[in-house]
Protein backbone atom coordinates (compact mmCIF):
# COMPACT_ATOMS: atom_id res chain seq x y z
CA UNK A 1 0.00 0.00 0.00
CA UNK A 2 1.42 3.35 -1.06
CA UNK A 3 0.27 6.82 -0.21
CA UNK A 4 0.71 9.50 2.36
CA UNK A 5 -1.02 9.59 5.75
CA UNK A 6 -1.88 13.29 5.34
CA UNK A 7 -3.44 13.07 1.86
CA UNK A 8 -7.17 13.72 1.69
CA UNK A 9 -9.80 11.75 -0.22
CA UNK A 10 -12.49 14.00 -1.69
CA UNK A 11 -15.58 12.50 -3.23
CA UNK A 12 -19.02 13.32 -4.42
CA UNK A 13 -22.02 11.23 -5.33
CA UNK A 14 -25.05 12.04 -7.38
CA UNK A 15 -28.07 10.00 -6.37
CA UNK A 16 -31.70 9.45 -7.38
CA UNK A 17 -32.80 11.18 -4.16
CA UNK A 18 -31.77 11.71 -0.55
CA UNK A 19 -32.92 8.49 1.13
CA UNK A 20 -30.53 5.51 0.94
CA UNK A 21 -33.39 3.16 1.83
CA UNK A 22 -35.18 3.92 -1.43
CA UNK A 23 -32.70 5.84 -3.62
CA UNK A 24 -29.50 4.71 -5.36
CA UNK A 25 -26.15 6.05 -6.50
CA UNK A 26 -25.96 7.43 -10.05
CA UNK A 27 -22.41 8.80 -10.14
CA UNK A 28 -19.21 8.83 -8.10
CA UNK A 29 -16.06 10.88 -8.59
CA UNK A 30 -12.91 11.10 -6.47
CA UNK A 31 -10.02 13.55 -6.14
CA UNK A 32 -6.94 13.22 -3.92
CA UNK A 33 -5.34 16.34 -2.45
CA UNK A 34 -2.42 16.89 -0.16
CA UNK A 35 -3.02 18.52 3.22
CA UNK A 36 -2.65 21.96 1.60
CA UNK A 37 -5.53 21.20 -0.80
CA UNK A 38 -3.35 20.86 -3.88
CA UNK A 39 -4.85 18.33 -6.27
CA UNK A 40 -2.57 15.31 -6.63
CA UNK A 41 -4.80 13.00 -8.66
CA UNK A 42 -8.22 12.76 -10.19
CA UNK A 43 -9.73 9.36 -9.75
CA UNK A 44 -12.21 7.49 -11.83
CA UNK A 45 -15.60 9.00 -12.57
CA UNK A 46 -18.34 6.43 -12.89
CA UNK A 47 -21.90 6.84 -14.10
CA UNK A 48 -23.58 3.75 -12.68
CA UNK A 49 -25.85 1.73 -14.96
CA UNK A 50 -29.48 2.04 -13.87
CA UNK A 51 -32.72 0.73 -15.32
CA UNK A 52 -35.25 2.99 -17.01
CA UNK A 53 -37.62 2.25 -14.13
CA UNK A 54 -35.13 3.63 -11.58
CA UNK A 55 -34.35 6.71 -13.67
CA UNK A 56 -37.97 7.44 -14.54
CA UNK A 57 -39.00 7.30 -10.87
CA UNK A 58 -36.45 9.73 -9.45
CA UNK A 59 -37.80 12.68 -7.51
CA UNK A 60 -38.70 15.72 -9.65
CA UNK A 61 -35.57 17.69 -8.71
CA UNK A 62 -33.35 14.81 -9.83
CA UNK A 63 -35.31 14.26 -13.04
CA UNK A 64 -34.83 17.93 -13.95
CA UNK A 65 -31.21 18.46 -12.89
CA UNK A 66 -29.74 15.08 -13.86
CA UNK A 67 -31.61 15.33 -17.15
CA UNK A 68 -30.14 18.79 -17.87
CA UNK A 69 -26.61 17.74 -16.91
CA UNK A 70 -26.75 14.64 -19.10
CA UNK A 71 -26.20 12.30 -16.14
CA UNK A 72 -29.50 10.48 -16.62
CA UNK A 73 -28.56 9.56 -20.19
CA UNK A 74 -25.03 8.60 -19.13
CA UNK A 75 -26.55 6.16 -16.61
CA UNK A 76 -28.89 4.74 -19.28
CA UNK A 77 -25.91 4.20 -21.59
CA UNK A 78 -23.49 2.98 -18.92
CA UNK A 79 -22.35 -0.60 -18.54
CA UNK A 80 -20.63 0.11 -15.20
CA UNK A 81 -22.07 -1.81 -12.25
CA UNK A 82 -21.95 -0.49 -8.71
CA UNK A 83 -19.69 -3.45 -7.81
CA UNK A 84 -17.20 -2.44 -10.52
CA UNK A 85 -17.28 1.22 -9.44
CA UNK A 86 -16.69 0.16 -5.83
CA UNK A 87 -13.73 -2.05 -6.72
CA UNK A 88 -12.07 0.56 -8.95
CA UNK A 89 -12.70 3.43 -6.53
CA UNK A 90 -11.17 1.45 -3.68
CA UNK A 91 -8.14 0.48 -5.77
CA UNK A 92 -7.59 4.13 -6.67
CA UNK A 93 -7.71 5.50 -3.11
CA UNK A 94 -5.47 2.67 -1.85
CA UNK A 95 -2.72 3.99 -4.14
CA UNK A 96 -2.82 7.40 -2.48
CA UNK A 97 -3.88 7.05 1.15
CA UNK A 98 -3.40 4.21 3.66
CA UNK A 99 -6.57 2.72 5.13
CA UNK A 100 -8.12 4.61 8.03
CA UNK A 101 -6.11 7.80 7.53
CA UNK A 102 -8.25 10.18 5.47
CA UNK A 103 -11.56 11.55 6.60
CA UNK A 104 -14.25 11.50 3.94
CA UNK A 105 -14.05 14.99 2.42
CA UNK A 106 -16.65 17.01 0.55
CA UNK A 107 -19.76 19.17 0.84
CA UNK A 108 -22.58 17.70 2.92
CA UNK A 109 -20.40 14.60 2.95
CA UNK A 110 -22.44 12.98 5.71
CA UNK A 111 -25.19 12.48 3.14
CA UNK A 112 -22.80 10.81 0.70
CA UNK A 113 -21.43 8.67 3.51
CA UNK A 114 -24.92 7.30 4.25
CA UNK A 115 -25.14 6.01 0.66
CA UNK A 116 -21.56 4.71 0.64
CA UNK A 117 -22.16 2.90 3.92
CA UNK A 118 -25.20 1.16 2.44
CA UNK A 119 -24.12 0.53 -1.15
CA UNK A 120 -20.29 0.53 -1.04
CA UNK A 121 -19.32 -0.75 2.44
CA UNK A 122 -15.91 -2.09 1.36
CA UNK A 123 -15.06 1.37 0.03
CA UNK A 124 -16.39 3.05 3.18
CA UNK A 125 -14.10 0.86 5.30
CA UNK A 126 -11.06 2.60 3.78
CA UNK A 127 -11.91 5.94 5.39
CA UNK A 128 -11.28 7.30 8.87
CA UNK A 129 -14.53 7.60 10.80
CA UNK A 130 -14.31 11.40 10.69
CA UNK A 131 -15.64 13.68 7.97
CA UNK A 132 -14.18 16.88 6.58
CA UNK A 133 -17.45 18.59 5.69
CA UNK A 134 -17.08 21.93 3.93
CA UNK A 135 -20.77 22.67 4.46
CA UNK A 136 -20.17 22.86 8.22
CA UNK A 137 -17.72 25.72 7.68
CA UNK A 138 -20.19 27.35 5.27
CA UNK A 139 -22.85 27.30 7.99
CA UNK A 140 -20.44 28.89 10.47
CA UNK A 141 -19.39 31.56 7.97
CA UNK A 142 -23.05 32.32 7.21
CA UNK A 143 -23.61 33.07 10.89
CA UNK A 144 -20.30 34.60 11.95
CA UNK A 145 -18.86 36.26 8.84
CA UNK A 146 -21.41 36.24 6.00
CA UNK A 147 -19.35 38.51 3.75
CA UNK A 148 -16.95 35.60 3.20
CA UNK A 149 -19.68 33.77 1.27
CA UNK A 150 -19.52 36.42 -1.46
CA UNK A 151 -16.11 35.02 -2.48
CA UNK A 152 -17.40 31.47 -2.95
CA UNK A 153 -18.13 30.62 -6.59
CA UNK A 154 -20.66 27.85 -7.31
CA UNK A 155 -21.80 26.77 -10.77
CA UNK A 156 -24.44 24.31 -9.61
CA UNK A 157 -23.50 21.78 -12.30
CA UNK A 158 -24.54 18.83 -10.13
CA UNK A 159 -21.91 16.59 -11.67
CA UNK A 160 -19.74 14.78 -9.15
CA UNK A 161 -16.31 15.90 -10.40
CA UNK A 162 -17.33 19.55 -10.76
CA UNK A 163 -18.86 19.50 -7.28
CA UNK A 164 -15.63 18.15 -5.74
CA UNK A 165 -13.52 20.83 -7.42
CA UNK A 166 -15.93 23.49 -6.16
CA UNK A 167 -15.75 22.06 -2.62
CA UNK A 168 -11.95 22.19 -2.63
CA UNK A 169 -11.99 25.77 -3.97
CA UNK A 170 -14.61 26.71 -1.37
CA UNK A 171 -12.47 25.36 1.47
CA UNK A 172 -9.51 27.38 0.15
CA UNK A 173 -11.65 30.53 0.36
CA UNK A 174 -12.62 29.73 3.95
CA UNK A 175 -8.99 28.99 4.85
CA UNK A 176 -7.92 32.40 3.53
CA UNK A 177 -10.83 34.66 4.48
CA UNK A 178 -12.52 32.94 7.43
CA UNK A 179 -9.66 31.23 9.24
CA UNK A 180 -7.06 33.69 7.87
CA UNK A 181 -4.40 31.01 7.42
UniProtKB/Swiss-Prot annotation:
Q: Which residues form a coiled coil?
A: none
Q: Provide the protein's localization.
A: Cytoplasm
Extract the SMART domains matched here. EXOIII (SM00479)
GO CC, sorted alphabetically, is: cytoplasm
What is the official name of this protein in its record? Answer: Oligoribonuclease
List the GO biological process terms. Answer: DNA metabolic process
Q: Which organism is it from?
A: Colwellia psychrerythraea (strain 34H / ATCC BAA-681) (Vibrio psychroerythus)
Q: Name one GO molecular function term.
A: 3'-5'-RNA exonuclease activity
Amino acid sequence: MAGNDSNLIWLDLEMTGLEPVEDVILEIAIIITDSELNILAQGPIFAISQTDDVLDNMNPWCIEHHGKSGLTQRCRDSEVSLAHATKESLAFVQEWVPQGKSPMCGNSIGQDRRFINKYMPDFEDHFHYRNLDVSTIKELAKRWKPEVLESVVKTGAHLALDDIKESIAELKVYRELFFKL
